Amino acid sequence: AHRMGTSRSNLVNMILAEKVEVKTPEQQMNDIFSGIEELLRTSRELVPLFAPNTQRVTVRSSLEYKYHPTVRYEVELVRGFVPGESIGTLTANFRTTSQGLLELLTRFSRCLARIESRTLPFDVSYSIENGKFSRSLAYPAKRSRGSNDTGGTLLDAGEISRAITDYVSLIDGMLKACVGGADADTLYDMYVSDLEKRDILL
């Protein structure tokens, strides 16, 4: 267990899961995070930082602002997904001491919350404090084209990886547009345009 970087109880779960061909929650998370890492392998904007057997993956980006401050998007998943409940949290952590940039980021976070309250068929929670913005990730489900109705069937790890990666890419693009001077209407249009192409909401 020590050599694999995991606990003894988790190792037992992994062995049992292998025998009955069922994924443990830890294996499911590893598959999702490995998928995110693979999807971002060729990205010039987002750099994934993933350590196996953890409950989180970090994606690094930089802003076109004075001194090119770094933003780290941290995706942390819960152990075992339950239909109708949040599967985790996306946190954007801004490495900056610029008061002007922090105020801009706070405005962006509030703008995103307003946009999603108007466009998503479910509620998500937000928090903003000390240069850190967090948003809960809803239980992922496919929706019918032209409808926001979602089902309750859990998707496979590859589909969840894609949905999370696409969402982080959207938030990063909107944030960079905001830093570049985009107004609330422009951000709304960006979000809605992306939403129309999304098969999975979270």
Mark where each language-model region is.
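Detector for Asparagine
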Residues: 10-13, 30, 53, 93, ...
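Glycine-rich loops and low-complexity Gly/Arg-rich segments
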Residues: 12-15, 36-37, 119
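Short, basic amphipathic alpha-helical segments that act as recognition/interaction helices
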Residues: 6-29
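Non-catalytic interaction/regulatory modules that flank or connect domains
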Residues: 52-132
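Short, positively charged interaction helices/loops
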Residues: 21-54
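Hydrophobic transmembrane signal anchors and adjacent membrane-proximal interface regions, especially
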Residues: 38, 48, 57-61, 73, ...
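Charged, low-complexity intrinsically disordered regulatory/assembly segments
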Residues: 95-202
